[in-house]
């Protein structure tokens, strides 16, 4: 059955809520709050089979660090360290003074410098429509930077952007340092680059407390934008780095399936789980990956989406000091190759 991402999202949330069994009550003390955290993650986290962790042993290891009179800060640190064992940027503990996080991209080259792009490639001559910065570079390749999928983009905005870029020989979509946001904006953008219905991926939700209790995958599809709107069907390169996370990871995985698209840069930061939030007895909020999103081929992209073959590039400090963006330069080469193959 054909399902849009919006319908799937609502369906998964509804099914997740209906699948939750009666919750155990926990005391509002260090042990009760810890047990509430461990139990909810144990029953609802969706990536145990990929993370190669013994959650039972991890729980015992960190519970042994508790003390009846420990401070809230000490408890927060113990719980945060336990969650980091999952290696999941979508899994966070949120208190009134801090948010735990696992940001693996901090260990890798940054691979993006906004100033270099603005000064040496756009020459500070660009347009801005809603959350999209765009322009045509000196080599007649179009460039658009979308730095946040939470940023609103209307259909009119996309018409204006793509109409301006229509004369370009190819298009670069830069989503480096885009930490994610609204999946519906992913769909809105992808629809401008397809001419027929696209199988974008599938979503599975938890059906019970067991680590392998999952529904059958729900396939979701994107429809091309109607012919009254503007599409871009020339060669496209998407630029990504390790900070391309969550909804951006999803966008890159979908665009990579299109025949006229290449991915250049570094592996994305992953984050393919659909988050769910719950509260501990003391009021702290917990966010975790609770529904599994796969790509159209059934592959889990929780650990990131690799660049297209031959398109892995890192930026060096020496190049950046000279105002060179090696990832953008490689994108030019790829677009030239793709353009020559079309002739």
Give the predicted meaning of each segment.
Residues 1-18:
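Sec-dependent bacterial lipoprotein signal peptides
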Residues 14, 165-167, 230:
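Alpha-helix termination/capping residues and helix-transition junctions
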Residues 21-35, 40-41, 179-343:
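C-terminal "post-core" interaction segments
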